[in-house]
């Protein structure tokens, strides 16, 4: 995993899917849908990217709001986005912390990881409640092969 400080206010990494991470002091003031959509389709990210806005609440505690590509909207929680936010917070602001409490719109998540060498992350663990938020059906007669 390559975590890059882009030097112009954001970090970029891939936690299975690409994530843009930007810190903010006022998470509620961020236009997650408007800004998220612009960043998601920015030419710097040829295949698009998920967009995470992060507020550091305290030691080992962050809050995250995520605009998810594919969903094309803000989501209640994003596991790979919360992982990206925790790793970037560790690298940029809290190098001694390897377990984070993460507040998301849908509740609370936990991310923990090992760092056997600086910048090398292993045993990344995500915890949190899983809830059914939608039910639907697909008519496969309209699918094309």
List each language-model region with its residue ranges.
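Active-site proximal loop and beta-alpha junction motif in alpha/beta enzyme cores
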Residues: 4-77, 84-145
């Amino acid at each position: 995993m390559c975590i890059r400080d882009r030097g112009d206010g954001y970090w970029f990494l891939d936690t299975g899917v690409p994530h843009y991470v930007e810190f903010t002091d006022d998470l509620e003031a961020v236009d997650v849908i408007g800004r998220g959509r612009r960043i998601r389709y920015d030419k710097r990210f040829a295949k698009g990217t998920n967009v995470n806005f992060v507020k550091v609440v305290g030691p080992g505690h962050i809050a995250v709001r995520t605009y998810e590509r594919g969903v094309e909207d803000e989501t209640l929680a994003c596991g790979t986005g919360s992982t990206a936010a925790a790793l970037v917070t560790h690298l940029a602001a809290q190098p001694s912390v390897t377990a984070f409490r993460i507040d998301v719109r849908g509740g609370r998540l936990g991310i923990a990881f090992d760092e056997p060498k600086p910048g090398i992350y292993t045993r990344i663990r995500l915890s949190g409640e899983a809830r059914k938020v939608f039910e639907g059906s697909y008519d496969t007669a309209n699918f094309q092969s």
